[in-house]
Every structure is written in structure tokens, then in C-alpha cells.
Amino acid sequence: MSSIVVVGTQWGDEGKGKITDFLAEQADVIARFSGGNNAGHTIQFGGETYKLHLVPSGIFYKDKLAVIGNGVVVDPVALLKELDGLNERGVSTSNLRISNRAQVILPYHLAQDEYEERRRGDNKIGTTKKGIGPAYVDKAQRIGIRMADLLEKETFERRLKENIEVKNAYFKGMFNETCPRFDEIFDEYYAAGQRLKEFVTDTSKILDDAFVAEEKVLFEGAQGVMLDIDHGTYPFVTSSNPVAGNVTVGTGVGPTFVSKVIGVCKAYTSRVGDGPFPTELFDENGHHIREVGREYGTTTGRPRRVGWFDSVVLRHSRRVSGITDLSINSIDVLTGLDTVKICTAYELDGEEITEYPANLDQLRRCKPIFEELPGWEEDITGCRTLEELPDNARKYLERISELCNVRISIFSVGPDRDQTNLLEQLW
């Protein structure tokens, strides 16, 4: 039995989808464990580019199961749109499995997301307005509707009517707005559930069977550790737990099933949305990184904020996610810069600190302490080993590994599959 968890170590958009797809070649089952269609990942497969939001990366392998675990919140209409898009391009989706315990996103969740952001004004979180947070709130309040409920007409009808009554009272009191009506939701979403019915099952049992059969299971994370609701830059975070530990809760397997945790990062840092970002760049270096790296959100299309690599962030992610191996992407984006910088610590009120603060006001006062290294001009997009990299590029990666106390097992020098290079055997 062997299993690998892939997590983002920064604020999402680190290239997890590409690394998951790369590792999926040798896996038997690929499972998502958190988030929803607020996540976006770009996959290169068969010479084509695909942008996925809910569907696991393993969907492209007909002989492997692609699992949406119970920790994922599912918008059935959005999921069907994604599946139909794949089918139209000749991709079979018959290998998809959806947990019957996954929570369902409904139109009132999207409306609530919009109203909440509007209410916050200048203090808005910067959500994708996909209804993710409100769906997780309903789950915690024990009024959420699960996939198993959606499939049963009478259950769905009863639960939906009850929830609309609750939402109407809340929307009127908080936002002076009304909830979407029952007749605007029921028929469309019940029909969507019936179309998805063939995929819905107890996915925990599927994963347990895979472990018993000593198959290889790959757990695909969404967002990044710094967006984790407990361990990220709270409150500028997502509403779930992208950390590796959530695999057990979000898929229904025990912690003893996890063998390795691959932390994915870029050779720099990027972020979509609001919140503190100590190493953020506003100069020509930032412009270079954003344009060369095509740093625009897969889901939102918004320009991402970019900055130098932050080892304080990565050490925090390594600790709270138990990262055993590092995958560094987009090293090629830094080519052409005279010098490159790594944040080694922060200065807070005149004192040097090496751990990530929990207090947001303290974090805003933090100033990055940088170590400056020489850049490189050589084209590295064809490099396949560390030895083939220019000395300065190799030393840059080695310094990251040293500062973060984790070995580099994968490095990537471009978007294509053959530009992703394995240094250590992971399966």
C-alpha cells in the first residue's frame, strides 16, 4: 500500500494540478479531499490544455478512478458543465466517483457569498463568490444538504423548503435581500442530481478497498496551506482545510494510510485576493514575474499578486502539513533577472522572527529580511537534472531546500509534462 498527498505550500496556484497529473500516471486512484469549484488547475494532456475546477486531475486516465471526497463542496450544475465540456472534447468521465456525503452548493449559497462580500466593504475577504464559504457554514450548522439528500426527491424537497425559510429570514435581516425561490432551484438541481446519480457512492469504501488491495492512491489538494482556515492568514483564507491532515476527514480514511506528503510551491510567491503578503513586489521585477509567469487566476481571471520566495511561509507549511518532499515549479520564470531574493525571516517591531505570526496586525507590521543571490540568463526550459541547470539556478534551489529543511524531489522548468523532472522515487 502506498499513498501520496499533494498540497500547495503557499496561497494556491502553485501548479498542484500539473504535479498531481504527473504523479497520477503511476496511481490507481486519485482523490480530492477539500474545497470546491473555487479551486482551479490547468492540465496539459495529449497536447491539449484543460482547466478544471471540481473534477480531479485523474479524470484523464480511463483505467484510474477519479474521486470527489466528502470534504469537497459540490455545485452540481457547475460540475455537470465541467463534465459536459470534457465529454465534448472526447474525454470520458465514466471513471468519476462522488461521495454521497459531500455537501451540495445551492443558489442561495452563491447569493449569500455575494451579499456577505458586499456587506464587508473595504474589509472583504476577496472570495471567488462560488458559494463555498456559505456551504461550509451550513455544514457546520447541520442544515447542509448532501449528495445523498439531493438524489432523494422527497428528502431534497423537504430540506430545501426548510432551508429557504431560514435563509429568507437571514437575508432580510442581514442584507435586506430575499433568498432565491424554491421554484427557481428545485427542478434544475434535482435534475442535475439525477444526471450525477451514476457517479455517487460511498467513496470511503472505494478508498478502503484500494488500500486493502495495496493499490496506489494519490490525494489531490486544493488551494494552499496559507489559505487554510486554521493555519493560514486568517481571516483571509478559504473555508476549508487544505492541509494534508484533512485527507483523513475529507475522504474518510485513517491517518495511517498516508505515506508521503508532497508540498508544491513556485520558485517565487503569488496570491489572489486580499490579505497580508510580506514579500509582495510592486516594481519591474514583479511585472516580469507576473507577465512571464502568466499570473492570472484560473477561476477568476484576476491578476495575481506576486513576490519573492518566502521561506518563513514554507517552513510553516512544512510543519503543519508534515511535508516530506518539495516540488518547485516555474523556476524558468525567474530567468533574466539580475538578482533573485529569498525571504529568510521577518523583522517585527525591531526584532527578527523566523516563524509565521498568527496575529494579523503583527503580520502587517512584518518586514521581510532578504538574502540576495545572483540570477541567471541561460534558457533552462530544456534542463532535466539539477546538474544541467546553471550554477546560479541550482544554488538558488539548494538554498531554498536548506532554509526549509525539506528535500527537493521534483522541479519544473515549464508548463509541459516533459518539463517536470523527478529527482527522487516517490511511489
Swiss-Prot record:
Pathway: Purine metabolism; AMP biosynthesis via de novo pathway; AMP from IMP: step 1/2
Signal peptide, first to last residue: none
Localization: Cytoplasm
GO cellular component, one term: cytoplasm
Residues the record lists as binding IMP: D13, E14, G15, K16, N38, A39, G40, H41, T128, R142, Q223, T238, R302
Entry's family note: Belongs to the adenylosuccinate synthetase family.
Name of the molecule in the record: Adenylosuccinate synthetase
Native species: Staphylococcus haemolyticus (strain JCSC1435)
Organism ancestry: Bacteria, Bacillati, Bacillota, Bacilli, Bacillales
Gene: purA
